[in-house]
Structure formats: C-alpha cells, structure tokens
Amino acid sequence: MEKQYVLAIDQGTTSSRAMLFDRQGKVAGVAQREFGQIFPQPGWVEHNPREIMTSVYTTITELLNNAQIDARAIAGIGITNQRETAVVWDKATGQPIYNAIVWQSRQTKDICTQLKEAGHEQMVREKTGLLIDAYFSGTKVKWILDHVEGARERAQKGELAFGTIDSWLIWNLTGGKVHVTDYTNASRTMMFNIHTLEWDAELLAMLDVPAQMLPDVRSSSEIYGMTQTQYFYGEQVPIAGIAGDQQAALFGQACFEPGMAKNTYGTGCFMLMNTGDKAVASKAGLLTTIAWGIDGKVEYALEGAIFVAGSVVQWLRDGLRMLGKASDSQAYAERAGDNDGVYIVPAFVGLGAPYWRSDIRGAVFGLTRGTTKEHFVRAAVESMAYQTRDVLTAMQSDSGIELKELRADGGAIANDFMAQFQSDILNVPVLRPEVAETTALGAAYLAGLATGFWGSREEIAKQWAVDRRFEPAMADDKRQGLYAGWQQAVEATMGFRIS
C-alpha cells in the first residue's frame, strides 16, 4: 500500500496528541487526551508515567478509527515531547519506580544549591550549555535515586532505566526492545556533553547517576525500531524521528539557516535561534542547546526559556475568574485601549531567561482606582511580549545577529492583539504560519526524512507558508517608554522579599 501519511505523537505537559500529516505537511487527523497533574507538595509537579502511556495509546486508536486510516498507509512515527521530565523504571517489569518528575517541578532546588556551593557551575555550563537548575533532568534522576529505597544499587546493577519522555514512549511502543533518546533530549539532561556528544563521566559522578541506566543517544532522524503489532492493528510501523518539543517546533517552522528564530507561546514561552554548527556560549543568561542531529551532523541553538506565558491568561481565567475563556483575552485587551501604566510580572515560579531567579514571586504594579479588569487582562497579555523582548535582546547580544523576522507558534499566537503587540515591542515582523501545529509537524518531518516520505529539507522549506504577517506599527518613543516601564517593574519585583 502507498505510504500517504506520517504520524506524530506530541506528548505535552497536560495532554497527549496524535496527529497525521500528509505529503503537503497538512493535518489529516488529530486526537487528544488530557491526563492528571500531581502536586505532592507546593512547587512539586509530577505525572503518572503509566497514565501518560495510556493517553498515547488512546489517541493513536482514536485517530486511526476517526480518520479511518489503514495503518499500512503510515510511513513512520515521529515523537516530540515535554523536555527534561524524568522517568526511572524497572527494565524487567517496565514499571516506573516513582512518578515522572516534571520539568516545572522545583523539588530538586536544594540539590541545585548544593551543587552550586560545591563550585560546579562553570563546569556544567561549559560541558552542557545549561545552568544548574531544577528545570533539567539530572537532578531529578538523582532525587529519585536518593529517595527510592535501594534504587541506586539497582541502577548500578543495570536493573533500572532512565529516560526523558521520548525514551519512555519508545521503550513501551517497542515492547522494551529499544532504549534510546536523541541529541535534543539528551542535551536537556545536564548529564550530556554537547561538544563530545556523549554522556559525561564527570557530570554523572557529580550527580551520582550510574551510566548503566542511561539510554543510547542517537540522531533526531533515523529508524530506531518498530512498534509492536497490537498498537496498529497487526502492523508494525517504524519509529523514525525524535525531538524535544521546542527543537521540533524550530524544525517545523523551517528555521534551517543560522540566524532564523521561532518563539512558541504555550504554557511557557520558548525562543530558539539556529546558530548552525557553532555552539554559541551565552554571556547573557541564555541556554546553549542542540537544535537537532541529522545525517551525521549536529546543529546548535540559543534558547531563552520563559516559565510563565500563556498560563498567565489561565490564571486570570481560573484563579481570578476575570475571564470566561482564554480566547476572551483579546477582546478585553483591545477594549482597554492601553495598559494605563499597569504591569504584571508573572513570576509565579520565579523568572527564567535571562534572569534565572527562582527566589522571587509575581507582582502587579501601577494600580489606581481607575484600573479596570480590561487593563489587568491587557497587562497580562503584554507580559508575554515584554519577556520575549528580554530574551531577544540577550539572543542578539550573544549571537551578534540582528533578527529579521520572528516565526511564532503556540496557542497564544492566535490572539491577534498579542501578535501585533509582540511585533510592535520587538520592532520586528512576527509571522504566524498556516499550519499552527509546528511542534508535531517538526516531529513528522524528522520521521518523514528518515523514511523517504520527504526528500530533503529544501522540499520541507517550500511547504512552509504564512497565515498572517504582523508588521511593527508603533512609534519608537512609545515602544521604548512601554519597555522601560516593564524593566522598572522587573527590578522592583526582584527587590521584594517575603520574610
């Protein structure tokens, strides 16, 4: 049977999705299933790994049934995933020994403090391109081995496996036959040397993580193994692409040349700039990460991670009851006319790039008796754009590249007000693509290249198309005045302490 589709599994922080893409890179079917969040203590976030797998199986079945697709028409599977989230499981039974510790979780912050006090920061930065932070997988694995009785000894005997979510999915889909990850996910663990492209013995010793439990690190586009027959009605489908969600979005946005950048507006906000074959060391609070590894060549990116973006609108809806639904934020923001001097710094879990301050709380500034709900909503939406400018300023400083345009994706970019304000505050055109599902599309492209479904990156680049281009339309003095107000608000937030 002719191969007509590539299947992308997009395993995110709150839901799992399965999506079919045709040869034109258009969505041919989608299924989605949410799963539970576990909050054992304030600041801790965990997932049940078995529930994640169930959500993935369910979406695959729903997708094939609803789209009435024969599994033989699927050329391959691409996997993209919430990065940094760590799972440790028993190799013999396939059962997790503890919940998955999620990227957002701060439960390893004390370990991070100890590592910093021991003087490891410079070494970690040079080898991994990362900072010592609870965000990354390494301290999460250490925490599990420290807190589950007998776990470290079992890991040393080769009885336990560690993986980011991509590894966990592939292990299960192949019936425990394949234990791999790709360069992009490995580069987010704080255990992988992005220059030698190997697990680093010095980093593993620092964290006391046995090498026996680690997955093989492979390219982002190759055939890793075949699925078991029960998932695709008796057929075996090759798993042929892996990338962490933000790198997958960079690939799905066809940012193939150095200096091209994308920003994803989801729960958090993640801007990546392709730096080609150069691992650019950041002096401005950004991360150096692997963009992808294809055809024996690794390419790098600079990344700015903003912890709270779209979730500030969810907070207005669920926490403050200011909105009926998140999409109402556009109408409220437009109705306000301006922010009336109100700024929201949404440091609910501290601030990410370029500040990296986990010790501060969110704040609101500039309230008067004339402040309305509309002003509040507008300030929340504007905070996404201001934080993005913080990151872009750092990115241009590190790379020496002046951004010509910003390709944008994620749920919040559907908000026309936010997209236009982003263009205005950056003074750079913002491009919204026709296919909004760029993360899943990137995973599909990686799998399609490995299976011959698509012939080259040039072919993929021709498929990328603009839905709408937002051009800057704000006077420079107004732009600089608004941003100066934001900088003042951030500085004041950093000075506030709860005793």
From Swiss-Prot:
Binding-site residues for glycerol, renumbered to this chain: 83-84, 135, 245-246
Residues that hold sn-glycerol 3-phosphate according to the record: 13, 83-84, 135, 245
Binding locations of ATP: 13-15, 267, 310, 314, 411
NCBIfam families reported for this sequence: glycerol_kin, PRK00047.1
The protein's annotated pathway: Polyol metabolism; glycerol degradation via glycerol kinase pathway; sn-glycerol 3-phosphate from glycerol: step 1/1
Known regulation of activity: Inhibited by fructose 1,6-bisphosphate (FBP).
GO cellular component terms attached to this protein's record: cytosol
Job description of the protein: Key enzyme in the regulation of glycerol uptake and metabolism. Catalyzes the phosphorylation of glycerol to yield sn-glycerol 3-phosphate.
Top-level division of the source organism's lineage: Bacteria
Species of provenance: Xanthomonas euvesicatoria pv. vesicatoria (strain 85-10)
Catalytic activity field: glycerol + ATP = sn-glycerol 3-phosphate + ADP + H(+)
GO molecular function: ATP binding; glycerol kinase activity
The protein's name: Glycerol kinase
GO biological process assignments: glycerol catabolic process; glycerol metabolic process; glycerol-3-phosphate metabolic process
Record's signal peptide: none
UniProt keyword annotations, A-Z: ATP-binding, Glycerol metabolism, Kinase, Nucleotide-binding, Transferase
Binding, ADP: 13, 17, 267, 310, 411, 415
Enzyme class: transferase
Keyword Cell division: no
UniProt keyword Kinase present: yes
TM ranges: none
Family: Belongs to the FGGY kinase family.
Documented EC number(s): 2.7.1.30
